[in-house]
């Protein structure tokens, strides 16, 4: 799928992803600091991904792990700092929600330390949860 707005475009085509942008962007995030390139590439291969592009250059990314009906975990939502605060993060979340793999998912989860206001606009709320963390190779 593809969405276009002026000079910006969002696509779910994994072959368009610029891994030379996506991998370091994820590795530089507070939630995935130090994550290996191999793990990031495997997570992309096994997820629904959206790339956000300005004039053909990657400036954003989001992914979701989902069974397409009951559960989805939204993660790695990011927009390059030079393109923030102009509505592109909202548009990325809109497109993710409209995607056929996500449109009918009953429960969608995410974990964040920031941007609570953005996610609350999409119906996300703080809830109790349990988590199991294991070291990755």
PLM feature segments, named:
Residues 1-35:
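Short amphipathic alpha-helix that is part of the acyltransferase structural core
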Residues 38-55, 59-78:
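A conserved beta-strand-loop-helix scaffold within acyl/acetyltransferase catalytic domains
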Residues 90, 102-137:
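Conserved active-site alpha-helix within GNAT-family acetyltransferase domains
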Residues 83-92:
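Conserved acetyl-CoA pyrophosphate-binding loop and the N-cap/start of the following alpha-helix
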Residues 17, 69, 114-117:
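Short alpha-helical
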